[in-house]
Amino acid sequence: MSDVQEATNQLLDVNLCENQMSIQVTESGPRSESEHLQVTIGATVPTGFEQTAADEVREKLGSSCKISKDRGKIYFDITVDSLAQVHCLRSVDNLFVVVQEFKDYQFKETKEEVLKDFEELAGKLPWSDPLKIWKINTCFKKKKTKRRKLNPNSSKQKIDNGRGDTTVEKDVKKELTNSVSDSQISDYYENPAIKEQVSTLIGDGLTSCKDETEENSKEEADPEVLKFRVTCNRAGEKHCFSSNEAARDFGGAVQDYFKWKADMTNFDVEVLLNIHDNEVVVGIALTEESLHRRNITHFGPTTLRSTLAYGMLRLCAPQPTDIIVDPMCGTGAIPIEGATEWSNCYHIAGDNNPLAVNRAANNISSLLTKIQVKEGKLPLGLPIDTIQWDICNLPLRTGSVDIIVTDMPFGKRMGSKKRNWNLYPACLREMSRVCRPGTGRAVLLTQDKKCFAKALSGMGHLWRKVHTVWVNIGGLHAAVYLLKRTPQSFVHPSEEDGERCPCTQR
């Protein structure tokens, strides 16, 4: 059997997830080699947090991890039974299985020759094992279309300022009930039968699915043809071709090889062609939408990605019983991510804007509803609270906070750069008051690096900069600063100064 025939046979049933729960576990016997199939997984991560993501992979999967020279990507090897755990990683945005990697691809001198090589490349690649992973991955990936149905109702709830939360909870429950991703990932760990089902699907060549397809083929003369698209991500200045040209010619060759149907929007398979200078990686996407789309259902004008929030929290290494505060929480992305991953700490989400506090509270409520649907019982709650306050006058005791993690106003969509010159020093001063001397730390994200550097220079006796991570947020070059609280005690400024906090100025 040729490689293309084998790959096609593994893809007979597109709707695997809809039929997974009806598959019966066969008699236990010798496990096939396919069950122990090892592949390389690629993941996109927030730029600057590649090392953080690599550390999480080593910690949770026990796999060695390689950081790509192409910023924002990591690679690691797994076996099939670890696939569900990969989808539970908190620091990765998108996942793909590597078909083949060319570390030093030799591009020809002319565009015509390069594109001709791309056409010939499609028939030379080892597609079989990656397509097996793609097939079983459909049981774990989140469905993009079902999330879109929820968004219009969520927007209406924002206008109502939190009224009608029952409708939102019903929509969340409906979404979670119809989706297999979260519940089946949980069942994968707790129920050995699910693991056996996965093994059966791979080891026995998707026997049950093929049987069902054969029954359907009696009604339909031809099996459904898979739809696909090719996406080319290219970085480098020495290429004589464009991304569209590479995707077009390589995609045409893939279509001729598999006899699939090209569809740029409603596709089943997304083939990736990643090019960075002389490094070429061909892969198959394992996520329909970024994994950072979790936790948040009520969005604000500046909602931080959950993957970036996780990276910021991990930078400060939370310990059990730590009190972690986000004094400018917005939608609550950071404290919600913290309460989910570090449940042995206590998290406080605060903001001076009542709408932001309301959004954070609604996001916490939605997360509790999600947990209730997943576990089938009322959750005990999360170690998190919300409060409205003034960042320059926090209602917290001096030296009572272990960690401060926050996304500071950039002065773009929120606030202004002019106000930041007064706001940043006042924020750092108040943060130094509530943070524990000697052991306290702060992780602060800002794009207004010049203003922050000036404010920090005047706080050298209270804060010491330990590390800086350069990140890209929506095209803006920002920085995440890890600060350590010095042992020096905080001294209140004299009342004679009469300094007004910029947070309260109108």
From Swiss-Prot:
Q: Which reaction does it catalyse?
A: guanosine(6) in tRNA + S-adenosyl-L-methionine = N(2)-methylguanosine(6) in tRNA + S-adenosyl-L-homocysteine + H(+); guanosine(7) in tRNA + S-adenosyl-L-methionine = N(2)-methylguanosine(7) in tRNA + S-adenosyl-L-homocysteine + H(+)
Q: Name one Pfam family in it.
A: UPF0020
**Quick one: a GO cellular component term?**
cytoplasm
Q: Which GO terms describe its molecular function?
A: tRNA (guanine) methyltransferase activity; tRNA binding
Q: Which UniProt keywords apply?
A: Cytoplasm, Methyltransferase, RNA-binding, S-adenosyl-L-methionine, Transferase, tRNA processing, tRNA-binding
PANTHER family listed in its UniProt record: THUMP DOMAIN-CONTAINING, TRNA (GUANINE(6)-N2)-METHYLTRANSFERASE THUMP3
> What's the protein called, per UniProt?
tRNA (guanine(6)-N(2))-methyltransferase THUMP3
Q: Name its species.
A: Bos taurus (Bovine)
